[in-house]
Amino acid sequence: MSIETYRQKIADLFAELDAVMSTDGGYKLSLSDTQKFSVAIGKRVLDKELVSNGKIPVYSANVTAPFGFIDKLLITDFSVPSVLWGIDGDWMTSYLPSDMPFYPTDHCGVLRCKTSEVNPRYLAHLLEVEGGKMGFSRSYRASIDRVQGITFTVPDISIQNNAMSKVADYEMAIKELEGSLEKIASRRSEIIRKALAE
């Protein structure tokens, strides 16, 4: 299968979850519920604090790729997954599994589940969708107060977990295909370079 086919399968799974919600109802949750969610933002990181051989990725408004690397932690407990969102850039979210240390800047929000009612990977999707509906953008910042104002409904956790297990499989297949494409591109460049050198 192609990368686009896997991406479509992921989109289809999220659409199926949305369909379950509209027919079977579900559980209503609010990100303002501090018993079920923790919502925080990071701290400012100056360029001079970044280190080329740092081990901890630093996430800023672009939460899909590290801004740089650092050798200190702001958060010390990584036993649970994290959902990141960009506060004042283009609206985007990302999911980081547990045991993956990172450092959020003051342009990056961190959302964590304290409840077993919602799958954290699914929560990243829900946050992205709901933030899009609210119009979060560079000009309409996704502040903590605004994010905590988000409410959503989720299907039974077993349905979420089943779908997110498939999403994880598809995402792994995409990474493997992207790795193969990078190797092919590198090999092609090497062949062209050798041919031009002759």
Question: What residue ranges belong to the model's regions?
Answer:
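Non-catalytic DNA-recognition/assembly elements of restriction-modification systems
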Residues: 1-64, 156-198
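DNA target-recognition domains and sequence-specific DNA-contacting regions of bacterial/archaeal
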Residues: 32-154
